[in-house]
């Protein structure tokens, strides 16, 4: 307080108080103390006995967001529902909107429940999958890679799925979202069949709630760069793109020789380092019916035992629905390991019958059509009773072969004797005939899932698999009394790790600590706890020690090899060419990622960290060049166009530039820095997110002193990942129809865009001879052109001139 006499003199109360609560502050300069009487008292006899309202009671309860009907007319893979869960929860009918509408940003997880109510006379199944961002071009048959639940009319009538916050940005903007966080897709996994007189539909309800809800940015209610690393010239004429050690950049566009720290905060903590993240997940490979007309001993299905097998297709959208296992293995020359077949049945409670599964060692060419049921019992076999609470038989085929590895024969059409892909065939027999009352369907559909244990692939290549010539079908369910984490990354790493060499991978185990699963072949794939039990169908020895000191299935080793990105040719002097590095799967080559890069960057939801770029210069030229990297969101020249640069040299060098001369170097290796305003970038986004959150950055190359004495000047660019690259949250692999290859080498030669990793080899004698010719005939090209024109004019004069009669 000021002096009382001073207050009287200035005729004002000289007291300043700062008051307020939470996000409201008031500064009062003529203030008095707060008048306060009494204090808050608890009630001895409560007026209301419910819990006081809070963020948890209001914002984290379940709300009914959707109802639908699953009809018998819905075909396999038909999308019963496609829901933007967060958008549906942001609804004035739900109490949670009272919190959300007064905040700008939020971080949250989502939990959903999908409920159906089938009768005992209905059979079939649905898959419910939570897809981050957008389904994009992912294979439908690989939806089990995502957090998912399987609904089987005979097993379960509810699934629960809980997912974390997965986003390229640190928070979700409610009023102007860049793209959806989570999309719930519900598809037919096995068609609905009904008994006589039963309803031709099953009703379906979807409940959803926020979990771990964090709200930020109170708002009034309203109506609705730098540079990286670059090594100029490995050697003048040779650059190795084959492996991580030689393909990585030793110089950087970054401001400093800096590193990027790991951050899993927006990726749900699910960091991926190894391709076994995908190969260990059972995904749908085929579907076949078990008919009442099948006789005992009849072969119902024959499947080659190789990881490339898949038969599922879809018409809307048009897809060859590759399995996750085939998607990974198609990119390698050789494979070995134990393949796991999951056979999931969709009966009613009134169907009864048995199937026998038999493995015949050999190769894909052996004839098994004459093997009888009795003969089949000699080979490794298992019998499954389709009746009861267990829906799934897990058949783990042990590695039995005459070679330590099998070869990927699908890359060519002609084969030599001894080149085999499969280690035999798996035959499905009718063991006991299917029996049922006359008022239910006379068939039971069986879904075939494929995954692998102790898988080792090596020697990378690029190949897009086609479907195997047969047919299939599938469905599933989900027990939810206990929560379990699905698809934990890198559960095991082939046979190259100490863990596998000790044989632990052969022990049945469950995801929940302290609970040991019974070891056996029968299980319930609908239950995510039981689905994670490592299969153990037959006794096996340890696989032994790998011949390779390097694990080719490591993402860092595989993608540390440089893969082709793009190529372009300059036609005139003082021009620049800019190309964005965009991960979007909606952009086709040459402006989108081609081939291996396209396949790889769509295997996961989020990418963060630097990238290494190798630029190969082709053509005998003496040209000065400059390259620079521009982070997303800044001024840049028009992409994919050869043009004069509109940017100043000050701007380019401030971003970080590298100068080079094409006579002195044939290649540049650059580390592109992770300079972004985003948490991560993604290749599978919808809407505006596909334009902003899918681009890593832009690379520009400018040339000077290019003249007619130079040959064509072409640049080819190759991309590889670094040791600081991070990949978060697995996605369903791209379906085969969406795999886009680059143009052929002959196409590029025709366009003058040679894809070459070396300069033209010229000896010292060649150079002396060329310089001698140039001195003697400095205008050779011009004189040749003049000669052509003179010959043309002479021929025209001859044709117009009347020749004199010949002399006698």
UniProtKB/Swiss-Prot annotation:
Chain span(s) of sequence motif (L)YPX(n)L motif: 146-150, 179-184
GO molecular function, one term: structural molecule activity
UniProt KW Protease keyword: no
Site (Important for VP1 folding and capsid assembly): 748
Keyword Cell division part of the UniProt annotation: no
Region (Disordered): 34-55
Any one GO CC term of the record: T=pseudo3 icosahedral viral capsid
Site features described as Cleavage, chain residue numbers: 2-3, 224-225, 470-471, 744-745
Gene3D superfamilies assigned to the protein according to its UniProt record, in alphabetical order: 2.60.120.20
One Pfam family named in its UniProt record: HAV_VP
Keywords for the protein's UniProt record, in alphabetical order: Capsid protein, Host endosome, Host-virus interaction, Ion channel, Ion transport, T=pseudo3 icosahedral capsid protein, Transport, Viral attachment to host cell, Viral ion channel, Virion, Virus entry into host cell
Gene Ontology terms describing biological process: monoatomic ion transmembrane transport; symbiont entry into host cell; virion attachment to host cell
Family: Belongs to the picornaviridae polyprotein family.
Identification of the protein by name: Genome polyprotein
